[in-house]
C-alpha cells in the first residue's frame, strides 16, 4: 500500500479498547462512489464523505466514526479522496 495514502489522525478514533491512530485510504472504484454525486465528493461535501469514507478506509471506519471526526482529520482524509479523482496526468 502506498505510504502517501496513510493519514495519521490528530485525534485518534476510539473503538472500544482499540485506538485507531492511522487510516489507510484505498483508491475508490466506481462502485465505491455509488449513491453519491461525484460533484459532492469532489467538493468534499460532508454528507458524501460520511458515505464513501467507510468504503475506502482500512481499518474500516463506520459512518458514525467519520461523522465524529475532528475537522482537521476530516479535511486530511477529504484531500486524499479528492486527489484520487484527478487523472494521473494532472497529479
From Swiss-Prot:
As for what it does, the entry says: Promotes tail assembly by creating a scaffold for the tail tube proteins. Tail assembly proteins E and E' would wrap the linear tape measure protein to create a tail assembly scaffold.
Keywords noted in UniProt: Late protein, Viral release from host cell, Viral tail assembly
Q: Spell out the InterPro entries in the cross-references.
A: Phage_tail_E/E
Family membership, please give it: Belongs to the mulikevirus tail assembly protein family.
- Protein name as it appears in the record: Tail assembly protein E
Q: Name one Pfam family in it.
A: Phage_TAC_7
One of its GO biological process terms is: viral translational frameshifting
Q: Which residues does UniProt call coiled coil?
A: none
List the lineage, top down: Viruses, Duplodnaviria, Heunggongvirae, Uroviricota, Caudoviricetes
Identify the species of origin.
Escherichia phage P2 (Bacteriophage P2)
The organism's superkingdom is given as: Viruses
